[in-house]
């Protein structure tokens, strides 16, 4: 069996920044540091931060007064920000800047009284945060659609004053079909020049397609609650390549690889490379050879840290 590695894979700039914000806060201020929601959707990362003093909560009413709170990479609603400010909590915002870009678009449509359609998955924290940027006080409304069927049944107030945005971690192929359905049903609809799916999601989806084309089975390292990791698994399966979403080497079954010649490995944007290395080591123990990385798109994007953490870490 031969191992092939997707390129790029694993951590993106937004995840790197979010994890580093928690790390720096722990170093500068000491534990405990409260984090609203898992800072990124990866069990290994969350458990590591928890062991060092991060306390993960789902709502601010679980947070005592006079502590530091970090908002996760997925972003939060305006109501959460207002609650934190009203309680005087010290907040560091780890929202991915590409999610913030979508928030700004939604807030602008809200101010203009323009109805907005969000393409996304119900219940995902990014979707909840993005929906929560819309203030209907100016007469508009925001709607959530997941697929073409939702578009077909959607009732809006004014199809002439309508715009769309998208969750950043969706399947590009699925989203393209939903956007086409929106434009067909609502010809006057506005939106971003291209969808809001982030560069890292696009690059990892392109890479897994190449991997699935060249391999007999694909392993996606990522947690079950990671949206972008699930999309990678689905893309490989759509290309008729068996694919498995695993948290790490311990989730693998040797029988998956009976009769397999080429094993492809990729990782979601929240999965650290150490987990990929663990998978490679286990496969090699089962007789696999090599770990050749495919040609791919270079990523050199970085996002700046909050100023207070950046300055204090140098003292």
Curated annotation (Swiss-Prot):
Isopentenyl diphosphate binds at residues 41, 74, 124, 226-228, 270. Its cofactor is [4Fe-4S] cluster. It catalyses: isopentenyl diphosphate + 2 oxidized [2Fe-2S]-[ferredoxin] + H2O = (2E)-4-hydroxy-3-methylbut-2-enyl diphosphate + 2 reduced [2Fe-2S]-[ferredoxin] + 2 H(+); dimethylallyl diphosphate + 2 oxidized [2Fe-2S]-[ferredoxin] + H2O = (2E)-4-hydroxy-3-methylbut-2-enyl diphosphate + 2 reduced [2Fe-2S]-[ferredoxin] + 2 H(+). Dimethylallyl diphosphate binds at residues 41, 74, 124, 226-228, 270. Keywords: 4Fe-4S, Iron, Iron-sulfur, Isoprene biosynthesis, Metal-binding, Oxidoreductase. Binds 1 [4Fe-4S] cluster per subunit. (2E)-4-hydroxy-3-methylbut-2-enyl diphosphate binds at residues 41, 74, 124, 168, 226-228, 270. [4Fe-4S] cluster binds at residues 12, 96, 198. Its EC number is 1.17.7.4. Belongs to the IspH family. This is 4-hydroxy-3-methylbut-2-enyl diphosphate reductase. It comes from Pseudomonas syringae pv. syringae (strain B728a). The lineage of its organism: Bacteria, Pseudomonadati, Pseudomonadota, Gammaproteobacteria, Pseudomonadales. The gene is ispH.
């Amino acid at each position: 069996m031969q191992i092939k590695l997707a390129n790029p894979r694993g951590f993106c700039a937004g995840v790197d920044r979010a994890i580093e914000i928690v790390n720096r806060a722990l170093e500068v201020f000491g534990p405990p540091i409260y984090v609203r929601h898992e800072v990124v959707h990866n069990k290994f990362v969350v458990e590591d931060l928890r062991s060092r003093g991060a306390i993960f909560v789902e709502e601010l009413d679980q947070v005592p007064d006079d502590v530091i709170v970090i908002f996760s990479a997925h972003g939060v609603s305006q109501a959460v920000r207002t609650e934190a400010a009203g309680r005087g909590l010290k907040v560091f915002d780890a929202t991915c800047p590409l999610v913030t870009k979508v928030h700004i678009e939604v807030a602008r449509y809200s101010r203009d009284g323009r109805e907005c359609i969000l393409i996304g998955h119900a219940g995902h924290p990014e979707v909840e945060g993005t929906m929560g940027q819309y203030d209907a006080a100016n007469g508009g409304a925001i709607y959530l659609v997941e697929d073409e069927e939702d578009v077909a049944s959607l009732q809006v107030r004014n199809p002439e004053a309508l715009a769309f945005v998208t969750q950043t971690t969706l399947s590009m192929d699925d989203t393209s079909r939903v956007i086409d359905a929106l434009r067909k049903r609502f010809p006057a609809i506005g939106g971003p020049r291209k969808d809001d799916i982030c560069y890292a999601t696009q690059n990892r989806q392109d890479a897994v397609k190449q991997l699935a084309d060249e391999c007999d089975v694909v392993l996606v390292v990522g947690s079950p609650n990671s949206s972008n990791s699930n999309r990678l698994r689905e893309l490989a399966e759509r290309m008729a390549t068996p694919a498995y979403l695993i948290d790490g080497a311990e989730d693998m079954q040797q029988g998956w690889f009976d009769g397999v010649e080429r094993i492809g490995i990729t990782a979601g944007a929240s999965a650290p490379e150490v987990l990929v290395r663990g998978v490679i080591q286990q496969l090699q123990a089962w007789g696999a050879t090599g770990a050749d990385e495919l040609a791919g798109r270079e990523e050199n994007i970085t996002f700046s840290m909050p100023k207070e953490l950046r300055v204090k870490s140098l003292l």
